[in-house]
Amino acid sequence: CKKCQLEEACPIHAAKKNTDGKLEIDVELCNHCGRCIGKCPFHCNDEGVDGYKVYVGGRWGKKIAHGQMLHKIFTDKNEVLDTVEKAILLFRSAGESGERFADTINRIGFANAEKILLSDELLQKKAEILGLDVVGGATC
């Protein structure tokens, strides 16, 4: 094609034609927004899968923090709910008294938190974590 509709639809320019004129998608750059799905009149990219992005560590208030996206696109709603449960278990097990979840993520490091959240380690220790004697008290 002279003008690739997928390339035109990509807001971050991850879809580009190479020197041979064939479309390539830079998987490191692509944020999986789905805007390119169904744009080709020749149906080269019609098959898309709906998914969910999960962000952790965000915070509103006086000390705003932007959440960071886990490097996985979840395609199953139950898997997302499990990840939310794991985030709560992570906060309960690794959070310190008076600390917000965003602070916990910053303290243990996003890469470490992501590794833990994408494993089933916390769900296996759920009863133990729920049995912990913890003290809340986060302040704004």
Predicted feature locations:
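Iron-sulfur cluster-binding cysteine motifs and their immediate structural context
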Residues: 2-23, 35-52
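Acidic, Ser/Thr-rich low-complexity intrinsically disordered segments
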Residues: 6, 120-140
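Generic secondary-structure signature for well-ordered alpha-helical cores
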Residues: 15, 35-38, 45, 85-97, ...
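Short Fe-S-cluster ligation motifs
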Residues: 27-45, 65-78
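Short beta-strand elements
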Residues: 52-60
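A hydrophobic, small-residue-rich beta->alpha segment in the mid-to-C-terminal subdomain
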Residues: 60-97
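Flexible, glycine/charged-enriched surface loops at secondary-structure junctions
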Residues: 93-107, 124-132
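Short glycine/threonine-rich loop-to-helix capping motif typified by GTGT followed
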Residues: 105-122
